[in-house]
Amino acid sequence: MSLFRRKLPIDLRSIDARRICIIKPSAFGDVVQTLPLLPVLRERFPNATISWAINRGLADLIDGHPQLDQIIPIDRGASLNGWRQLLSQLRREKFDIVFDLQGLLRTAVMTAATRAPLRVGLETAREGSHLPCHMLLPDTGKQVPAHLRYWKV
């Protein structure tokens, strides 16, 4: 199975996902703007386990959120061995859907490492981070705030 596939038109309402991961490691404001996505995902996938990969220093922002089941802490200055351990953990989780909502090279590597059958990224992604994604959330420009943009899920 290839890590990098062609983009497919996918209706997320037709997916029966059991394990979902949000990859949005930083920054404070971006994490806060992503929080409204959790109830949307929970409503759409009521029986799924929802995880969030986030920098350890920001994990307290989401800890205890009622729609979140698991926090995967990321050590920003981790050694190569720490990075490998993180990628191994992401692969072992066997996610059905992964959302790369950061759109950077490091989050693309994390997204690809999951080998999830459905990987969703941002049309505005940089550094080639769209490559491991099957579906891209459209660019809505600055007219639509980030937290509303994610509702397109």
Segments (PLM) and residue ranges:
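Catalytic machinery of carbohydrate-active enzymes
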Residues: 1-153
